[in-house]
């Protein structure tokens, strides 16, 4: 009777699943950014670190400061040329990621 019992290990059925999770090509696809980088000019200074920007293609968007710019206390004033990340889901809002000199 003891010969008929088969021990079941909890990791036995998950070997194939772990190979799929650790597949490097799938991880690259997940981490790939879906943002659009554009350059623009600051036209207005709004409250709470938000700015009205005119992009190089003529579209006006509202952009907020990225965390690194806030941490390093980089000042952005009207007339500065900046790089903006736009989400493909809402092209009217963006994140300011770099101030050009």
From Swiss-Prot:
InterPro entries named in the record: NA-bd_OB-fold (IPR012340), RNA-binding_domain_S1_IF1 (IPR006196), TIF_IF1 (IPR004368)
Statement: the UniProt record of this protein carries the keyword Membrane: no
A GO term from the CC aspect: cytosol
Compartment annotation: Plastid, Chloroplast
Organism domain of life: Eukaryota
Main location (coarse class): plastid
Keywords for this protein: Chloroplast, Initiation factor, Plastid, Protein biosynthesis, RNA-binding, rRNA-binding
GO molecular function: ribosome binding; rRNA binding; translation initiation factor activity
Region called Disordered, residue ranges: 1-35
UniProt domain S1-like: residue ranges: 26-101
Residue ranges with Polar residues bias: 1-10
UniProt xrefs under CDD domains: S1_IF1
Pfam name, any one: eIF-1a
Protein role: One of the essential components for the initiation of protein synthesis. Stabilizes the binding of IF-2 and IF-3 on the 30S subunit to which N-formylmethionyl-tRNA(fMet) subsequently binds. Helps modulate mRNA selection, yielding the 30S pre-initiation complex (PIC). Upon addition of the 50S ribosomal subunit IF-1, IF-2 and IF-3 are released leaving the mature 70S translation initiation complex.
Subunit note: Component of the 30S ribosomal translation pre-initiation complex which assembles on the 30S ribosome in the order IF-2 and IF-3, IF-1 and N-formylmethionyl-tRNA(fMet); mRNA recruitment can occur at any time during PIC assembly.
Similarity comment: Belongs to the IF-1 family.
Name assigned to this protein: Translation initiation factor IF-1, chloroplastic
Lineage of origin: Eukaryota, Viridiplantae, Chlorophyta, core chlorophytes, Chlorophyceae
């Amino acid at each position: 009777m003891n010969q008929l019992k088969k021990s079941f290990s909890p990791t036995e059925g998950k070997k194939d699943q772990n190979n799929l999770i650790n597949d490097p090509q799938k991880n690259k696809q997940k981490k790939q950014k879906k943002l659009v980088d554009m350059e623009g000019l600051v036209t207005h200074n709004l409250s709470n670190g938000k700015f009205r920007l005119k992009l190089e293609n003529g579209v006006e968007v509202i952009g907020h400061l990225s965390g690194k710019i806030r941490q390093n206390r980089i000042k952005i004033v009207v007339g500065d040329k900046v790089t903006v990340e736009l989400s493909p889901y809402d092209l009217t809002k963006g994140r300011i990621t770099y101030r050009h000199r």
